[in-house]
Amino acid sequence: MLPYMDQVLRAFYQSTHWSTQNSYEDITATSRTLLDFRIPSAIHLQISNKSTPNTFNSLDFSTRSRINGSLSYLYSDAQQLEKFMRNSTDIPLQDATETYRQLQPNLNYSVSSGNTLSSDNTTVDNDKKLLHDSKFVKKSLYYGRMYYPSSDLEAMIIKRLSPQTQFMLKGVSSFKESLNVLTCYFQRDSHRNLQEWIFSTSDLLCGYRVLHNFLTTPSKFNTSLYNNSSLSLGAEFWLGLVSLSPGCSTTLRYYTHSTNTGRPLTLTLSWNPLFGHISSTYSAKTGTNSTFCAKYDFNLYSIESNLSFGCEFWQKKHHLLETNKNNNDKLEPISDELVDINPNSRATKLLHENVPDLNSAVNDIPSTLDIPVHKQKLLNDLTYAFSSSLRKIDEERSTIEKFDNKINSSIFTSVWKLSTSLRDKTLKLLWEGKWRGFLISAGTELVFTRGFQESLSDDEKNDNAISISATDTENGNIPVFPAKFGIQFQYST
């Protein structure tokens, strides 16, 4: 489940019209969400409150080997945070959890018909207006968190300098570990590409990220290729000035919709030339209540590979919104009645309605001009070709919009998430839902392999409440056991 402060941060980005979908850091966010979701390792309780329209507080408790907790505080001078924030009772489940990310094609200034809030879908018309608004007001966000009993501190400051630029400062301080790290980010987003300059006091690390979007210019006919597909290419470069350790990677992402069903899908291909690691992912919304993801990893140097799968199954509420009662899983193309009857009554004409009638134009030609039969036939063929092509585009666009509207108008009560890896031989199960105003996450990670604990870090071993005893390894047979198990409650007002 998305932590409360992350929900506030998302609301800040939406209120200031900053889109995170252009960030190279989030270029593979969809596959990470479906495959690497976090499993609670203890009993966790989070209580949050919006004390004023601009201040937010959160208190966390967890019981692992001992009682741990943290206290968070956030302040922002953004004026429309309450428009995007919901308490745990009112927030839709698809907005409270991390799930498949539907991207908003860049430079597409058509008005979206969905009303449901999304972490990455901002109103593009507002973005366009903001980019040309000379009265831009700088906004800021201040966040701090203290952990106990360790007394570790973390802080973050975000400053919107202009409609295209943003400055971010993050800091972590740990007295026990004698660790103090400060990281600065300067981001510039032109919609076509986002550039990010990074500097960290840890090893004097310098970094540069860039992500460039292709297929972003609308065509003359507003076709589905330009409106519903996007191709992005990004890269990152790192250098530690103290140790002179370099790092780099590049990723290609393609996002589109199926023109037959309207369902979105995302493809990514990543490459790290220094470590020889290649990764490809395929993520798709297979239905309004199901999602599937597959990931293949391969290393050129060690010849090791891994195949991972993840999926989601959403449970809908039986009583849906009035506009969604008669919806079914079959998505029909645009009806002839909508196409042919009274087109002037609609606010926006369909594309094929803008094609001029060449036959009527010919009839207006003076009778003194004699048009040969073969030219008349050519005019008729052109009229039919343009009209049928644009009609097909309208049908594809209508199918995609119907699928999006079905998701936006659905009320989901719970979701099951599953993820498995063939090399690690693990199975992660997570259930998330709402109960009496609480957002609940409960899950476990099942292990099927002997070498699992040897592959864990010391922190992960300490987090696991259950371990394999010596008797479990008798005869080389290890039973299935839960390496992690926990439940998390969130409540906010």
From Swiss-Prot:
It is a multi-pass membrane protein. GO terms for cellular component: ERMES complex; SAM complex. It holds the Pfam family MDM10. The keyword 4Fe-4S does not apply. Keywords: Membrane, Mitochondrion, Mitochondrion outer membrane, Transmembrane, Transmembrane beta strand. It is found in: Mitochondrion outer membrane. It comes from the Eukaryota. GO terms for biological process: establishment of mitochondrion localization; mitochondrial genome maintenance; mitochondrial outer membrane translocase complex assembly; mitochondrion-endoplasmic reticulum membrane tethering; phospholipid transport; protein insertion into mitochondrial outer membrane. Component of the ER-mitochondria encounter structure (ERMES) or MDM complex, composed of MMM1, MDM10, MDM12 and MDM34. Associates with the mitochondrial outer membrane sorting assembly machinery SAM(core) complex, which consists of SAM35, SAM37 and SAM50, to form a SAM(holo) complex. Lacks alpha-helical transmembrane segments, suggesting that it resides in the membrane via beta-sheet conformations similar to those predicted for other outer membrane proteins and porin. Belongs to the MDM10 family. Component of the ERMES/MDM complex, which serves as a molecular tether to connect the endoplasmic reticulum and mitochondria. Components of this complex are involved in the control of mitochondrial shape and protein biogenesis and may function in phospholipid exchange. MDM10 is involved in the late assembly steps of the general translocase of the mitochondrial outer membrane (TOM complex). Functions in the TOM40-specific route of the assembly of outer membrane beta-barrel proteins, including the association of TOM40 with the receptor TOM22 and small TOM proteins. This is Mitochondrial distribution and morphology protein 10. It comes from Saccharomyces cerevisiae (strain YJM789). The gene is MDM10.
